[in-house]
Structure formats: structure tokens, C-alpha cells
Swiss-Prot record:
One MF annotation (Gene Ontology) recorded for this entry: metal ion binding
Binding site for K(+) 2: 245, 456, 459
Involved pathway(s): Amine and polyamine biosynthesis; betaine biosynthesis via choline pathway; betaine from betaine aldehyde: step 1/1
Gene: betB
The keyword Protein biosynthesis is annotated on this UniProt entry: no
InterPro entries, A to Z: Ald_DH/histidinol_DH, Ald_DH_C, Ald_DH_CS_CYS, Ald_DH_CS_GLU, Ald_DH_N, Aldehyde_DH_dom, BADH
Enzymatic reactions: betaine aldehyde + NAD(+) + H2O = glycine betaine + NADH + 2 H(+)
UniProt key word NAD: yes
Pfam family name, one: Aldedh
Organism: Burkholderia mallei (strain ATCC 23344)
CDD domains: ALDH_F9_TMBADH
Quaternary context: Dimer of dimers.
Name this polypeptide is given: Betaine aldehyde dehydrogenase
Site (Seems to be a necessary countercharge to the potassium cations): 247
Length: 489
């Protein structure tokens, strides 16, 4: 028997049975316990979700921006009231420590909805004078029905990040969470309905990549926002373009560089590096997994990093003292262990970790020890490829130009950071780094006000910040003639 029982779809403001006859299971990654059996959507279910979204979107868009704003603010209140219960659900589904899910996942999701609720009334057009008797004005209008496809590392946060700007702009959204962590999106749907969002404006369809493909190719959907891996993102983008030239937002993978210069506060640098590699057991797309350290301070830096890694408290996610949990799935566990084996085989020096944790309460979970490799080279797989697990690669460099060139020598461009006390060098280096999200003397915070997205193959478009509303609206230009029309014939 499962903990949460049978989970269905959420369509037209209510839970709904799927018609596929298929289900999949979701497990607690810390214990292996069956959490729920989840119904998988069929093509007919996706059609049903699109039809209800169209109907709901017309009602939603007809409301005033202030009305939409008030409803979204009510959803924020409900999320915050239920923070602890939602955090426990997220802990069970993702394996994250309860201290993390209580402080981060629902909190940051609610913050983003609150942010866009405030911006809903600020969506406006322009007036452009042409001549005394003629002018142009523009309207920003909603796209219609949008699709959101989420990743398994931040399920409810991603659902909030994608739905908030969409709904604030007057759109509807059909959201597909990852089949690895499918539970919390259904709770968000219930909250939206309770807050007053019309039926159909936020639907949830469950399933694997085949359901994501149905959404990406559906002619009734105007936009797809996807978070996940690069190769899957390319497939989504191809389907979206080939079917109906949908607009897309892609937040994809990364292999982000963290550059520690020789004048850095090394205690600060070590704190940043450990956070940038081991928060959420390393399952964060922006993690700074390529740590470039100037040669003169490398040994002192490594010493500080290893001291901090030794203090990491791996344990049961429900223990409030735990700050390091399991990986989200057995498949991810196998992938990470494969990369660790590759690092060893290619000659990287194992400084910490490097194995699965199997003693005592770790035995039934998908735990990997926080792993640090030194003496890494740019051509190693652990340096070139996204691992999405708790594996830090330390590389040394001599000059600023060398560090920048090597940091940019990747197809990724999601995030980057520098640690230095030299203000001029900090900004100079950041301006040369090819990444969409950058940090100076810090790492990892992505507040609602900050546009998030990548360069190169790390993404298209942005999430969060004011500019994201541009990706959920379209511009209509209207010319008005006050004078006499001048005929051509």
C-alpha cells in the first residue's frame, strides 16, 4: 500500500481520471517506500486539458488585471499557510532535507507568484504619435494556453515559476511535472482553484516524456516552457516549432564555472564552493561544479573545502539537523556513480567521498557521499559533462585570461561566479564570462526579481524578473486616423 494512494490528473478545476489505463509509481528516495501510484495522461486527456484551458482562459483574460492580482495573492497566502505540510510532501517526493524544503521550495515559489501578482496591473502598451491626426498604440495581450514541463529537482517551485507569469498575463497553463516527483503540482492546482482561479486555467497532466511530447506538439498550445536536460530541450523545441511555431522558453543544463582568485577571502570561497556543489545533493542546474582556483592559493583553498565537506550532515530527510539527502531516483544514482568511476579512471585525484553511502539508514536510499576531485583536467568527462549530483571538480589556473578562456570553453552557459576582493577584476571577469546568471562573492540565490536563464545550449528566454512577462504576451499594434482618409485610387 502506498503512502498517498492513487493520484489522478487535475483538469477543469477538479481531479480527473486518466483514460490511458496506465499508471506509474513514485518512491521515497530516502527509503525506497512506495509513495503513490499515479495515472498517466493519454492523448485524449491532453486534448481535454487543452479544451478546458481554452474555456477557462477566456474567463480569466476577461477579468481586470486587479482581479487576477487579488486571486494570485490569495494563492500566495494559501501556499504560506500550508508551507510545512507542502514541505513534508516535497521532502518525501524529492528526498531533500526537511530543513531545506521548509525554507526554500515553497517559500521561493510563493515569492514568485506574489511578485507577478504585483506586476499584473503593470502590463501596458505604448502610444506612438505619427503626425497631428494619426497615432499608433500597442496592446500586450495574452498568448492563450501555455504548457509548462517541469524537472524533478524543484517540483513545486518550478510549477510556481512557470505558472505565475503565465497567469498574471491572462494565460492558462497546462503543467506536466516530472514523473519522478509528480505530487506537489497537484497541491498547487488545488490551491489555485481554492484561491479563485477559474476552472481550466491551471491543469496538471501526469506522465513521462511522451506526455511532454503531446503538449509540445499540440496545435492548441501557444507556448511551451521547459526545464530539464539539453537533449530533451532540443526535442521539445523541435516539436514546438514543427507543429505550430510555438514560442518556447528553455531552462536547460549547465557546467558552471566558479573562479577563485588569489586575493579571495578563502573561507568565503570555500563556503561558496561547498554550497555551489552540495546543496540539494548537487541536484541544482546552476551548480558551480568546475571550480577554478588560482595556483598560488589552491592548497589552502582545498584544505578549507575538505574541512567543510567533513561537516556535511547526511541523514534522514525528516531529521531537522540533516543538510544532505539522497539523489532523487535510482537512475540518477547510477548515473552519478558512473561519473565518479569515470573521474577515477581518467586520473582525477579523489579527495573526498567517491562512493555510495550504504551503512545503517542509508542502505535503502539513493545516497552518494559528497565527492571532491582534485588535479582535474578540462578534457575529463567529470569536467565537461553535467553530472547533476554531489561531485566537485577542482582545477588550477595561473592567469585571469587563462581562467576566462577555459571557463568559456563549453557548450553550456547557464551560470558563473567569481570570488575576489578586487572590485575591478570582479566586474571585468564577469563581463567576459559567457553565462546568463552570474554571481560575485556569492552563489545560488535566484530571487523573483532576477531574470534566470542561460547562454548557448543552456537555454532560450528567461524566467523571473520583469522581462519574463514579454514571453507570455504578444504585441498588437493599432493605427488610428483622426483626419480624412487619403485614398490611393
Amino acid at each position: 500500500m502506498s503512502v498517498y494512494g492513487l493520484q489522478r490528473l487535475y483538469i477543469a478545476g477538479a481531479h480527473a481520471d486518466a483514460t490511458s489505463g496506465k499508471t506509474f509509481d513514485t518512491f521515497d528516495p530516502a527509503t525506497g517506500e512506495l509513495l503513490a501510484r499515479v495515472q498517466q495522461a493519454s492523448a485524449d486527456d491532453v486534448d481535454r486539458a487543452v479544451a478546458s484551458a481554452r474555456e477557462g482562459q477566456r474567463e480569466w483574460a476577461a477579468m481586470t488585471a486587479m482581479q487576477r492580482s487579488r486571486i494570485l495573492r490569495r494563492a500566495v497566502e494559501l501556499l504560506r499557510e500550508r508551507n510545512d505540510a507542502l514541505a513534508e510532501l516535497e521532502m518525501r517526493d524529492t528526498g531533500k532535507p526537511i530543513a531545506e524544503t521548509r525554507a526554500v521550495d515553497i517559500v521561493t515559489g510563493a515569492d514568485v507568484i506574489e511578485y507577478y501578482a504585483g506586476l499584473a496591473t503593470a502590463i501596458e502598451g505604448l502610444q506612438v504619435p505619427l503626425r497631428p491626426e494619426s497615432f499608433v498604440y500597442t496592446r500586450r495581450e495574452p498568448l492563450g494556453v501555455c504548457a509548462g514541463i517541469g524537472a524533478w529537482n524543484y517540483p513545486i517551485q518550478i510549477a510556481c515559476w512557470k505558472s505565475a507569469p503565465a497567469l498574471a498575463a491572462g494565460n492558462a497553463m497546462i503543467f506536466k511535472p516530472s514523473e519522478v516527483t509528480p505530487l506537489s503540482a497537484l497541491k498547487l492546482a488545488e490551491i489555485y482553484t481554492e484561491a479563485g482561479v477559474p476552472a481550466g486555467v491551471f491543469n496538471v497532466v501526469q506522465g513521462d516524456g511522451s506526455v511532454g511530447a503531446l503538449l509540445s506538439a499540440h496545435p492548441g498550445i501557444a507556448k511551451v516552457s521547459f526545464t530539464g536536460g539539453v537533449e530533451t530541450g532540443k526535442k521539445v523545441m523541435s516539436l514546438a516549432g514543427a507543429s505550430s511555431l510555438k514560442e518556447v522558453t528553455m531552462e536547460l543544463g549547465g557546467k558552471s564555472p566558479l573562479i577563485v582568485f588569489d586575493d579571495a577571502d578563502l573561507d568565503r570561497a570555500a563556503d561558496i564552493a561547498v554550497t555551489a556543489n552540495f546543496f540539494s545533493a548537487g541536484q541544482v542546474c546552476t551548480n558551480g561544479t568546475r571550480v577554478f582556483v588560482q595556483q598560488a592559493v589552491k592548497d589552502a583553498f582545498v584544505e578549507r573545502v575538505l574541512a567543510r565537506v567533513a561537516r556535511i550532515r547526511a541523514g534522514k530527510p525528516s531529521d531537522p539537523d540533516t543538510n544532505f539527502g539522497p539523489l532523487a531516483s535510482a537512475a540518477q544514482l547510477d548515473k552519478v556513480l558512473g561519473y565518479i568511476d569515470s573521474g577515477k579512471a581518467e586520473g582525477a585525484k579523489l579527495l573526498a567521498g567517491g562512493a555510495r553511502l550504504v551503512n545503517d539508514h542509508f542502505a535503502s536510499g539513493q545516497y552518494v557521499a559528497p565527492t571532491v576531485f582534485g588535479d582535474c583536467r578540462d578534457d575529463m568527462r567529470i569536467v565537461r559533462e553535467e553530472i547533476f549530483g554531489p561531485v566537485m571538480s577542482i582545477l588550477s589556473f595561473e592567469t585571469e585570461d587563462e581562467a576566462i578562456a577555459r571557463a568559456n570553453a563549453t557548450d553550456y552557459g547557464l551560470a558563473a561566479g567569481v570570488v575576489t576582493e578586487n572590485l575591478s577584476r570582479a566586474h571585468r571577469a564577469i563581463h567576459r564570462l559567457e553565462a546568463g546568471i552570474c554571481w560575485i562573492n556569492t552563489w545560488g540565490e535566484s530571487p523573483a526579481e532576477m531574470p534566470v536563464g542561460g547562454y548557448k545550449q543552456s537555454g532560450v528566454g528567461r524566467e523571473n524578473g520583469i522581462t519574463t512577462l514579454e514571453h507570455y504576451t504578444r504585441i498588437k499594434s493599432v493605427q488610428v486616423e483622426l483626419g480624412r482618409y487619403q485614398p490611393v485610387f
